Amino acid sequence: INMKLVIDVETNGFLDTLDKIHCMVFKDIETGKIYSYNPDQLDEGLKLLKKATLLIGHSILGFDIPALNKVFGKKFEYEGAILDTLLCSRLIWANRTDLDFQYKQLPPKLYGRHSIEAWGYRLGLRKGNFKEENTFDVWSQDMTDYCKRDVEVCYLLYKLIEAENYSKDAIKLEHQFAYWINKLEQGGVDFDE
């Protein structure tokens, strides 16, 4: 199977405190099919993730993959390729602030930002306001719908990244660098006394 999935997960906190994944949503970029997994279906979602040859996500290296590893441990071991749209966005559109003045719908506080929220405005697919109106303590269907919207925005961003035909070597190098920086952030650095 040559399955390429855009993914997003919603958790009950940031990496340092989270202990639960509430839901996962994936989109197969070849078929357009959406896969949605709520708390009682997460094992089924993990099986599909492991089959994918490419996982695409916004901050997938910095958050989603480490969150899956933290919560599921050995149950989640992914060996395929990863494309982080946040890293690609920062690399390809380093001058984002200069470009953002053309987007009348984009709130000025999002100028220059590479967040999925900012990209939602730019791509005409707003995220919604679940984050402002809710906590992430307990799963709800609204949370899964919010996760689906993030996946749709990420998919559109992925298509935009692909259309740029940016240097694959530069993207690969950026991902390798981010991988090691994330390892340092998570594990810390030892100092001689």
Question: Each PLM stretch: what is its role?
Answer:
Residues 1-111:
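Conserved RNase H-like, two-metal-ion catalytic cores of nucleic-acid enzymes
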Residues 30-33, 120-128, 187-188:
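A short, hydrophobic secondary-structure junction motif
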Residues 63-71, 115-119, 153-156:
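Alpha-helical scaffold elements adjacent to nucleotide-binding pockets in ATP/GTP-utilizing enzyme cores
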Residues 71-72, 123, 164, 187:
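Residues at alpha-helix termini
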Residues 73-77, 124-126, 190:
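Short coil/loop linkers at secondary-structure junctions
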Residues 80, 88, 128, 133-193:
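Mixed-charge, glycine-rich, non-catalytic linkers/tails in nucleic-acid processing enzymes
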Residues 82-137, 145-152:
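Metal-dependent DNA phosphodiester-chemistry modules and their immediately adjacent helices/loops
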